Amino acid sequence: MRKIMLVIMGLGCISLANAGQAPQPCGPAGQLADEFSANVGSDARCFELRMYTAEAAVNGEGGINDLHQRFREEEVAIFEKHGAEVVAVWQRLDDPNTLVWMLAYRDRAHRQEVWAGFAADPAWAALREKYPVGVSIEAYMMSSTNYSNLK
């Protein structure tokens, strides 16, 4: 029963982090409103910084170690299969239950394509079932500045 609840909670967190909100702008300056584009590069990609704070493990299941294993084992590969670039994955040192990662996309439309493919991928469903980790999610959409080394 606990495993089923964690899977349901994990699905809910993904849905909450990706739905019900107006899409935040990101990508090249030419695709952004004037209020966002003044300092954004014409060749900027869309970056997404995501922070997942894992619930504590219960009876050895779930928790930050299972979340890292899920990423290590296949989650990164599934995103890359659907066209995202996983720029980096970090362990927060001031909050050891939080994994931070950054993805890059060509633009907002590409992000939508990547997430649709990821969500529909049977490998993701199997991985989520294998490592049912309840997480709270913070996500930020960004475009690189016109003077950034990272484009």
Give the ranges of each region predicted by the language model:
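Positively charged n-region of N-terminal signal peptides that target proteins for export
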Residues: 1-4
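Bacterial N-terminal signal peptides
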Residues: 6-15
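Short S/T/G/P-rich N-terminal loop/turn motif that feeds into the first structured element of a domain
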Residues: 16-100, 104-122, 132-151
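Acidic, polar ligand-binding/catalytic clefts
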Residues: 125-126
